Amino acid sequence: VICPDLPLYGMTEYYGKVVYQDWVDCAAEIVMYYQAREIRPTFLFGLSAGGILAYQTASGLPEIQGVIATCLLDQREPLVRKNVVSSGWMAEHGLRLISKASAWLGFIKVPIKWVGNMKAIVNNEELAEVLMRDRRSSGAKVPVAFLHTLLNPHIHPEPERFSRCPVLLVHPENDRWTDASLSRIFYDRLNCSKDMKLLKGAGHFPIEKEGLMHLEHYCVEFLEECLAQRLVSNCQ
């Protein structure tokens, strides 16, 4: 299992300008690096915004057996944008300011919690406060240019033309940040083999015991089904 820190978050060091497409490129490079070292079936797992990132990464790579995501948030959709931001003011005015400022002031960093509703990242208020104080996590500062590109991603192919691999959406049932209906906007358009499961009792970051147990069960089941299908295809 490889769980990398992408630029702007975690312990990864970076230099120069960082935009959202860099995340897609980094994820693809990491996958190709490990695939070149060892031939194994490869699955991508995306948590929160990482769900659509996993989809984008899989879209550009030939040997991906499956994608698992807790959310599939298409930020191009106005309804999705409106619900992921921190406030009504941000939805009405802030996003427009970010778009206008990106060209000239894209290098300026702002706390991600000013833009995203980080208070709802988990359903435990104490843990949410800890995460928002962590400058390598929900308390991170990110460039305006990154925010602009995150909110205006280039998604190719569109889900109606995606047939690269099966997709499993394991959406938290009690997500107070991004309701499952927001992920369904993108999920329902997918033209590949797909399945959706709800993680009972789980918040946006599924830390609850019941939700984690369901997450493990659904993921293992999905992996086994995909690998069995791969074996059948190889024998034909």
Language-model segments: residues:
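Conserved alpha/beta-hydrolase
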Residues: V1-E13
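Catalytic active-site module of serine/aspartate enzymes centered on a nucleophile-bearing elbow/loop
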Residues: S193-Q236
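Short beta-strand/loop motif that positions the catalytic acidic residue
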Residues: S163, L169-H171, D175
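Alpha/beta-hydrolase-fold enzymes
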Residues: A49, L53-G139
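Active-site nucleophile elbow and catalytic-triad environment of alpha/beta-hydrolase enzymes
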Residues: K141-P159
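Short alpha-helix in the alpha/beta-hydrolase fold that links the catalytic acid
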Residues: C165, D179-D188
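Conserved acidic catalytic loop of the alpha/beta-hydrolase fold
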Residues: V24-P41
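Acidic catalytic loop of the alpha/beta-hydrolase fold
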Residues: S138, N174-T178
